[in-house]
């Protein structure tokens, strides 16, 4: 079964269950609505926001918050969509406890048949770090997780760009198995 990508720069980690990519809103309300409706059509029930409070206002023009619009659009279809913010500073990795919290949230959502969308600003650095650590949690080595992430992102229009973006983020992935509470 083929699973559509809702908008540019998104990619399925687990088709129909775990989607990743960039900030789903926009500075244009109509574009934001189109993107959010596309997430709903993909069955997304949980959105995990890795951006920091206020980060979207730093764009020029500033991006609009999306949670209210997402809930309104989901309500029209009778679908319940939750959002949770677990912030990571741009270009950085979270603490091991922070990454465990993010991965536990993803695991719970998938286990309860609630497809999840994980995003940061551009969908490469923080999002790539989370996806690669998720793959390590599933049994891949850090380097294997990074290679698999590269393959998963090939369908994204920015898939040719490095993800995670920084060497520190990539090193975090390589070390993740030592910090994952599932392995301790």
Enumerate the language-model features and the residues they cover.
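Ser/Thr-glycine-rich phosphate-binding loops at phosphate-binding pockets of nucleotides
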Residues: 127
């Amino acid at each position: 079964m083929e699973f559509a990508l809702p908008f540019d720069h998104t990619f399925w980690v687990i088709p129909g269950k775990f989607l990743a990519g960039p900030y789903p809103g926009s500075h244009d309300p109509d574009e934001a609505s189109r993107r959010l409706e596309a997430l709903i059509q993909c069955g997304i029930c949980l959105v995990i926001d890795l951006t920091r409070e206020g980060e979207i206002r730093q764009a020029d023009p500033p991006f609009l918050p999306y949670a209210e619009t997402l809930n309104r659009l989901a309500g029209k279809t009778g679908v319940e969509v939750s959002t949770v913010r677990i912030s990571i500073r741009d270009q950085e990795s979270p603490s091991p406890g922070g990454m465990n919290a993010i991965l536990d949230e993803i695991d719970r959502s998938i286990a309860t048949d609630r497809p999840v969308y994980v995003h940061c600003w551009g969908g490469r650095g923080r999002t790539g770090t989370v996806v690669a650590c998720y793959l390590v949690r599933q049994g891949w080595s850090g380097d294997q997780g990074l290679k698999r992430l590269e393959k998963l992102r090939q369908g994204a229009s920015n898939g040719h760009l490095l993800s995670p973006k920084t060497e520190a983020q990539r090193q975090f992935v390589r070390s993740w198995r030592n910090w994952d509470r599932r392995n301790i």
